[in-house]
Every structure is written in C-alpha cells, then in structure tokens.
Amino acid sequence: MKEIKAILRPNRLSVLRERLMLLPNFPGMTVSKAEGCSARSVLQGSARPKDDLADYVPKVRIEIVAPDDTADEIMDVIIKVGQTGQVGDGLVWMTDIGRAAFLYKTTSLGAGRSDMLNKPSAKDMPL
C-alpha cells in the first residue's frame, strides 16, 4: 500500500478529480484546504513581520491511499494535471503504508493482513 499526498493549486482540483475518476481502480481521495509559500518567497523575506503572515497562497492538499499496483499511475496523473511550469505549482510525494483498513467494513488493505476478516468486529468489542 502507498499513501500519495499532494499540495496543488486549487484551480487544478476539478480537472484532477475528473482524470482520477477515469482510472479503473481509483480508490478515492481526501481533499483539504491548505496554505503555503515557495522556497523563493521565504528566501526573499520581508522586513515587516505583518507581511510574512500575509504572503501565504491558497492551496489544496490531497491524500490518497492506494494499492501498490495503481499508485504510480495515480501519481503520474497528479503530476501531469498539476504541473503548469510556474513556481508554486506544488508538490507530490508517495510513502509506504504498512497497513490500512476501511472503517465501514472489516476489509484490510495491508498486505498479509487477511486475518482481519476472521477477527470479531468492533461492535462485538467492549468500548
């Protein structure tokens, strides 16, 4: 399993969603509002602290947990859609996940964890 995270320009989100939904095994995504600044704006700096608080640019943060066999394809779509060639386009990265599970069912997403299916459900466990 892989976790793919991306910080993108908000105006790229609708196109990205359309393209990702075309992938046959797209697992879904979580989207959050974010703010950020590029390294260039940090290095240029500001003489007034008030300016430092106002120079953040609106972004969206996307998080996707995907099987190993689809993660590279998802990341490629994010790169193609998000890249405009301008400073501030954003960032995308991928990390390994040892184990994940859907909360609405007892299906484990992590490799080697099929034993989850034989364990008692959460409703059978005391709180």
Regions found by a protein language model. Name each.
Residues 1-127:
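Positively charged, small/polar-rich N-terminal and surface patches that mediate targeting and assembly
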